[in-house]
Structure formats: C-alpha cells, structure tokens
Amino acid sequence: GVEAEKAMHRIYHLRSQLMPYIYSSVRQCHTDMLPLNRGMYIEYPDEEKAYQYPGQFLFGDLLLGAPITSKGEGEKKIATQEVWLPGGTDWYNFFTGERQEGGQVIKTKSPLEQFPLFIKGGCPLPMQPYTERMCSTPLTELIVRCYPGKEGANNTYILYEDDGLTQDYLQGKYATTRLNYQKSGGQTIITVSPVEGTYEGQPRKRAYRIELPGIPVQARVSVNGKKARTTPNQELNGVIVPIKVMDIHKPIVIKIQ
C-alpha cells in the first residue's frame, strides 16, 4: 500500500545518499577480491557467532545489515530481529542513532520504513545529497558522517571516484580522498585530505557537510583553525558543520572539543 511505497522511496533515497560509500566499496571489491555483501565469517572467521547469524552481513567495511524476513505486527508493522554486533567497536543504529556496544546479541524492533542497519563508531562515512543520477552526477557536495568513536580511535576510509561512465579507470584515471577520524584526550579530529588523482569531468571544487551525530550543540568546533558555525540537527541528534566550496586539493581539518 501507500506506506510500503513511502518506505521503498526512503530506502531508494538512502541508496542514492550512500552512493559515494557504495561506489568506493565496489572499487574495493575490484582491487581486493572481496564481495560487497560479506558474510560475517569473512571478517570474523574465529568468532563462533559469525556462523550462527547467516541472515546478516557486512555491507562494505563500515555497515552491518540484517534484513527482516518476518511479518511486522501492529499498526506500525513493528518487526523484531536478533542481530549479532561484533566486538571491538561501538555500533550505531543508522536510522535512530542509538548506540550499542559491540560483542553482544541484541533484539531490534523496526517499523516498516526501517530495518536493522548499523554503522561502526569512529569511522568516516562518505555520502552525498540525494540525486537521481547517483553514479554519473559529479560529487559537488561531499557529506562526511562520523558517529562517535572510542578513546584512541584512529580510522581511515578511502573515497574513490571516477567518471562513472567509462573504463578509463583501467588507465589510472580516477581519484582518491583519505578521510580520517581520530579521538584522543577528549578531542576529536576529522581530516579530509587533498584529492589525489584525476579523471575526465572531475570537479575542481566542492562544498562539504560534516555530520556529527551525538555531538552536543555546545561543543567547540573549528575548521582549519577557525571557529566554525554549527547547525543543530534533531534527526541526527547532533550537529552539522557546513563548509563552503573549496578547492579539492586543499586539506580540511575539523576539530571538536
């Protein structure tokens, strides 16, 4: 019905927003011979529970999905699902922002428009605004979403880009951007390194939006040493740091205290 159609549209939009991450993950599949949807036992071969939950999988390096296959109950079609969250990191519900410690099995409850989708804490996730032409539209605004990491976290994700149309990447025509998250001594540093590499149609400049779930409005935030304007966001339960259009070859360093 109408509710199911709305739920489908929301997930379709999410796919578009996640395309920088998905595209980078597919590149990793190409270079490292890994599947995009990975059984838990691929990353955690020594964990007994990795073999006990075949219905869930890692979607690239950062996301964990557990599709619901049971009927939802009640007016909101709430469905329950057991999910195993591997240890060594905190996991955040992508839709609600709720934090869960790793190393446990939890029981989730999801309405029709959601499903159990979790992201590792302390890892930069590249995203983009919704666009219908999600692969070939130039990335003129890069969204970097970072859920809080544990003390001592130091994680890097490599954003991959090419023209999205040809096989010129086989001749080395592509670009990468290092996204790094560090947390130490009560300070969080997020770094967007200069873009390396070129390809046809590559944008020379882009805007940025740093999304910080779980960060309070009163937090002190700076961008390249200057105090930054932050915007509270209720859906994220955190703040957004908008960064105006910049040359892609200039670094961006965001500090949060």
PLM segments and residue spans:
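Extracellular/luminal ectodomains and secreted, surface-exposed scaffolds of diverse proteins
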Residues: N224-D247
